[in-house]
């Protein structure tokens, strides 16, 4: 292993239904496991899938989950096929069957910023560089405005009117919370650019 070697660690936490398996655990124990993982690896990503119920996902979000899925398909070709029999090849059952729009609205109502950003991979903010930014708290200078911009893109392109209204209000509220004046100005300019580009595309 060389001195410049680095990697990213991410855990996908899956519960086992106690009604289906003798060694399954209850929701409270699952939440404790997630909390222990967050304390043990504070900078690692933690993904909670749609295998968990809405109630479990909401609880674990507050314990430090960093990613959740929405409108997931687990069958072969599930995203490409709309046929009713497609789910017959599902790899596992889904507990949270809400649409992506419903998931985004739910997160907004809980006060979270739904982020579709993957810029840290494209920009090389991984491994030791990511850890340096995270431990110093400077990662927020990148992630906060990027989250607002990717949310804006989603709202303009795909969201229902209800979700768009709630999300737009959250963006305006969060924009003023960006501590750096320079970053705040750039974020505001890019948010306006996103809105203008969408308007022109719809003319």
Question: Where are the predicted features?
Answer:
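Single conserved hydrophobic/aromatic residue that forms the stacking wall/gate
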Residues: 1-9, 201-203
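A short, structure-level motif marking secondary-structure boundaries and short turns
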Residues: 18-19, 40-42, 87-89, 145
């Amino acid at each position: 292993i060389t001195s410049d070697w680095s990697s990213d660690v991410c855990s996908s936490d899956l519960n086992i239904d106690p009604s289906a398996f003798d060694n399954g655990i209850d929701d409270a124990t699952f939440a404790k496991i997630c909390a222990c993982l967050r304390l043990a690896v504070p900078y690692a990503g933690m993904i909670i899938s749609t295998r968990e119920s809405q109630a479990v996902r909401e609880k674990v979000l507050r314990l430090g989950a960093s990613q959740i899925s929405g409108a997931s398909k687990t069958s072969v070709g599930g995203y490409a096929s709309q046929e009713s029999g497609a789910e017959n090849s599902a790899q596992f059952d889904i507990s949270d069957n809400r649409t992506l729009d419903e998931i985004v609205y739910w997160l907004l109502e809980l006060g979270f910023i739904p982020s579709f950003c993957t810029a840290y991979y494209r920009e090389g903010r991984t491994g030791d560089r990511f850890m340096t930014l995270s431990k110093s708290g400077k990662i927020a200078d990148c992630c906060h405005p990027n989250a607002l911009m990717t949310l804006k893109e989603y709202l303009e392109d795909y969201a229902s009117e209800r979700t768009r209204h709630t999300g737009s209000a959250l963006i305006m509220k969060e924009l003023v919370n960006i501590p750096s004046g320079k970053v705040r100005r750039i974020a505001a300019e890019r948010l306006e650019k996103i809105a203008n580009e969408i308007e022109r595309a719809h003319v």
